[in-house]
Structure formats: C-alpha cells, structure tokens
C-alpha cells in the first residue's frame, strides 16, 4: 500500500522540465515523445527511469481531410477517395519514423491495433506504402492534370492546389512531421502550409468548415471489440474532425 499521494498542479508546459529535474516520482500525462531525448539525458542526474509505453489509440498522429470544407471546389476534391489515397501514398512513414521517432514507431494507417480482435493487417497497410507514381496517377485520373509554373496542380476553378494543414499549436512534433510530408507532396503537385493555432480556435475552425486538413491523434479506441461503440467510424458527433457538420446534423436531428 502507498501511504500518501501528493499531486502537484503546474502549467502543462512545465511538466517535462519538472520531470527532468527529478521533482516528480511518477509522470505520464503531458509528456510527449519530443521530450524523450531531454528526459533520457536527465536520468543519471535526477535518478529516474524513462519508459516507453504503447498507446491504445489507432495512431499517435493522423491527418484529417475535412469533408465538410466550405469551399465547394475543394470539398469535391477532398471527398474523392482517390485524392485521399493519393495523399496517403505520398507520405513517407518510414522517413517520419526514423527522423522523428528514432525508428521506435509502428508505421501504418489510423486503425485498430493488432491486439484488437477486429484487426486485419491490411487495415494498417492499405494505401500506406510510399508510391509517388501511383499517387500521381490517381490525381491525373481525377482530372487534376493542369499545373502552374511551380508544378502545383490546378483545381477545376483554376486555383493552385495549396492546402493549409492546421494544428493545435501544442507540439513542434506535428510541424516537424508536416515539414517531411511537405517535401513529398510537392512531388505529386500539392503544396501544403502548416498553420498552428490554439486548441479552441483549431476546433472551431474545423467545426465551421474553414479548415482543409487538420492533424490530431487517431481513433481513441484502438482496442475495439465487437461490443465497442462504432461511433468513431461514422459522423455521429461534431467532434470528429473529418466530418464535423455531418456529425452536428446527427446530434441535432438536422436542426
């Protein structure tokens, strides 16, 4: 039995620093993978051990195209499954794993984990292998064949396919990953810009249909079973970043 627990209240931005100086005995929340190197360096000095624990989410981070984007031309593009598959096959997950996660991550899609009884290996691997040739072909098949002088594909309205990927601004890890994605998406004629903000602004922009793509953690329950709620996989709530307006419509009975 433990005689006493003492919970210290601190700004979440200070948690990793306080942990690294040995001020806490046990800490998990508010420690991110981008704190890993800093924490490992402090082990001998502050007499603690840094442990890596697997997450129960479908993916540590995932990209969410907003199928309810207000721009009707862009909305039509985002809703085309060929476009989303093209984006996925132009993400070099191996590079991200090596550069950001020191090769310690598992590469693949945002889906249930191998420990889930519903898991199938192709859920994680389908459209998740780097294949720029296949990506370019899918985009060509969509009719996005015209390009500007920079090589950026043009949308049907003549505007370049410049996409803003929005983040909650809480971690440099997300912007570092987007920098790596940026280089490969340029090779398929798509230019992206990362836009950090604050969490409430980030979510409100998504809910309002102002966001094209956002980056956030994957499905909450990566260990789903036949008895689990399937709500995360259908537009049942505004909180789901890929279809917030459909979710809102469901929650309000269309009102």
Residue locations for each model-derived region?
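Extracytoplasmic/periplasmic ligand-capture domains
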Residues: 1-102, 106-107, 115-255
């Amino acid at each position: 039995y433990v005689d006493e627990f003492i919970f210290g209240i601190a700004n979440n931005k200070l948690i990793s620093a306080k942990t690294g100086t040995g001020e806490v005995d046990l800490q998990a929340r508010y420690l991110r993978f981008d704190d890993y190197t800093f924490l490992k360096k402090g082990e001998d000095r502050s007499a603690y051990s840094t442990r890596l624990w697997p997450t129960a989410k479908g993916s540590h981070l995932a990209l969410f195209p907003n199928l309810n984007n207000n721009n009707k031309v862009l909305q039509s593009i985002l809703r085309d499954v060929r476009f989303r598959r093209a984006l996925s096959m132009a993400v070099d997950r191996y590079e991200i794993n090596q550069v950001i996660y020191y090769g310690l991550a598992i590469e693949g899609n945002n889906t249930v984990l191998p420990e889930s009884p519903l898991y199938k290996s192709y859920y994680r691997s389908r459209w998740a292998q780097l294949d720029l040739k296949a990506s370019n072909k899918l985009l060509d098949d969509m009719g996005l064949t015209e390009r500007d002088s920079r090589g950026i594909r043009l949308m049907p309205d003549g505007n370049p396919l410049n996409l803003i990927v929005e983040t909650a601004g809480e971690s440099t890890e997300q912007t570092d990953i987007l920098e790596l994605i940026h280089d490969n998406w340029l090779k398929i004629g798509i230019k992206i810009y990362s836009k950090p903000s604050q969490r409430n602004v980030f979510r409100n922009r998504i809910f309002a249909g102002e966001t094209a793509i956002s980056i956030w953690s994957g499905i909450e329950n990566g260990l789903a079973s036949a008895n689990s709620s399937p709500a995360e996989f259908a537009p049942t709530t505004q909180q789901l970043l890929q279809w917030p307006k459909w979710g809102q419509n469901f929650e309000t009975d269309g009102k």
